[in-house]
Amino acid sequence: MRSIDSPPSPTALRAAHLVERLGRLLRAGDHATALNPAQAEALRYLARANRFSRTPASLADYLGSTRGTVSQTLLALEAKGLVERQANVRDGRSIHLAVTPAGMGFLSADPVRALAAAIEAAGAGACLADDLEASLRAAVAERGGRAFGACHTCRHFRRDQRPGAFPHHCALLDEALSEADATLICAEQAAA
């Protein structure tokens, strides 16, 4: 990523302002629902995260928030019946978070869906997504954060390792993965 000291091109600056404006429009749409923007983004993350990444700590890392802020956000989502805590069957000391059917219903009317439809209508889907992902990865790396990404794009992902419902494998976590798992975002993702 380019240094803050060197001026960006007018095109790059225009793109950054457009991304910022889109973010503001999404947050305004969130306010029109029963959720504040932090709650909406947390719900979106939990719906897109794999089973290993649906934890309060991973959510805090993804949002760039403190654990305390995320705790309050989760309490609000639980009170609204959109998220529930589940004991980790492998490690009783930790919990996993799950989006409830009501939460999934809420997401079916998510303002992000309208934005995705506009992007698709403009014919900019795949190229735009790739460019934005590269920009996001560079910005996150510059700030020392974790990128989060889909399992199937990770260097630890092993495709078609066994027959059955869980054909793929995560070499980092030594876990079998389903086809659906492969499309979800992971806190441990490392670009291939």
Name what the model sees in each region.
Residues 11, 15-18, 32-35, 50-55, ...:
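Hydrophobic/basic alpha-helical segments enriched in Actinobacteria
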Residues 76-126:
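Charged, amphipathic alpha-helical coiled-coil/dimerization segments
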